[in-house]
Design a protein with these regions (language model features):
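Extracellular/periplasmic catalytic domains that process cell-envelope and extracellular macromolecules
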Residues: 46-48, 71-73, 93-97, 158, ...
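Solvent-exposed, acidic/polar segments of extracytosolic/periplasmic ligand-binding ectodomains
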Residues: 115, 168-220
């Protein structure tokens, strides 16, 4: 896990989830965001006998980790959050080592054949031809979607108050991402994720459809 707020949040979440299965990590290894040599950390994982490694790190650290493990003959099942779910990017920078990695997902895969997704893809070609169509481009669409829906509900008489009221009226709104619900008290929106796996030729393989987090504290 990355030795910062992001990594530590992931570590704590992993601990809580494993505890529901009466399990715990056999190794918890911090790395600095800019660390370049992970030899000792990866050897520690290998020597521990860990069959699965959960990563909460940035793409560069993840790449170094996988390449290091390839040189020492260590092949665990890698699992990560949606932070590393851009399979096209990760496959390229790891030299193909990303195949088989399991991650969370923001929404539909960039290659999905869906009317709304196809519309967004064509719009991207027209209005942002210099940008690479992929998971994080699509994530921006997912994140902006509730605001677009609110603006549609407000109509021409736009104001801050009217927009906020429309946002707070959104219930189970879903397009290409998870269902989103906002209220005046709660703006978390959702805690649902999909689980996907990187297959051959950067194929997105759906392992688990939208699933809500039963441990989410914002609901309680």
């Amino acid at each position: 896990y990355q030795n910062d707020a992001y990594g530590k949040d992931g570590l704590e979440g992993g601990r809580k989830r494993l505890a529901t299965y009466k399990m715990k990590f056999i190794e918890e290894i911090p790395v600095e965001p800019g660390e370049k040599d992970l030899s000792s950390q990866m050897l520690k994982f290998k020597n521990s006998g860990a069959e699965v490694v959960l990563m909460f790190v940035n793409p560069t650290v993840a790449t170094i980790a996988l390449k290091t493990c390839a040189t020492i003959g260590y092949k665990p099942q890698w699992v990560s959050s949606n932070t590393l779910s851009d399979y096209g990017l990760m496959h390229k920078i790891t030299g193909g080592l990303w195949e088989g990695v399991i991650t969370g997902a923001f929404g539909m895969t960039p290659t999905a054949d869906h009317p709304l997704l196809n519309m967004y893809r064509e719009a991207a070609k027209k209005y942002a031809p210099e940008e690479r169509w992929g998971t994080f481009f699509l994530a921006g669409v997912v994140f902006a979607d509730p605001l677009v829906e609110a603006l549609k509900r407000v109509g021409p008489n736009l104001s801050t108050e009217a927009c906020l009221k429309a946002l707070n009226s959104i219930r189970d709104h879903q397009t290409i991402g998870p269902k989103v619900t906002w209220t005046p008290q709660i703006h978390q929106g959702t805690d649902s994720i999909q689980v996907q796996k990187c297959g051959p030729n950067v194929e997105y393989i759906l392992l688990q459809d939208w699933t809500s987090n039963d441990l989410a504290t914002w609901k309680k």
